[in-house]
Amino acid sequence: MNIIKTNIEGVLIIEPRLFRDARGYFFESFSEREFEEKVTPILGHSVHFCQDNESMSSYGVMRGLHFQRPPYTQSKLVRCVKGRVLDVAVDIRKGSPTYGKHVAVELTEDNHVQFFIPKGFAHGFAVLSETAVFQYKCDNFYHPEADGGISILDDSLGIDWKIPTEHANLSEKDTKHAKLKDFDSPFDINVDLYL
């Protein structure tokens, strides 16, 4: 796998090693050993995934921007196995020099790229194809009582979702999240969420 650092520390793009021939292709979508060897030294700590999730959505669906509050914080490793999505991580750690900044990456069934989102970030995606199947690994179980979010349509974040606003399809819950300026983050850059 090839690890690409982004403009925000700890947010990583991962390109798998793909083997193609006349029959099609093969790649390891996840190897704990290789993740430990290549990603852990960059992060400075281990990440142990415990839950895999999958969603299917149609064009214009936007999910996010989600996170789980302490003590149930989550890191995520995400990929698109069918279709095309724009995936985004927003730094919501108080005191961070990149607070409110984001990294956006297009994940597709053709590029097989994966995106690592650390704890302390809000995560969301928009479906750019007719349908998309999205998979993600989490290092903590889902805890609905710790569920949180910020508005995925907050213009102050400067995210180009590549979808006209009139085509955006959000859940009722996601329409109620606060904008960043009205948001009191439960995360602080000086608190190690991996201890």
Predicted segments with their positions:
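Non-catalytic, conserved peripheral segments adjacent to functional cores
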Residues: 1-110, 131, 138-195
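Conserved metal-binding segment of the jelly-roll/cupin
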Residues: 107-131
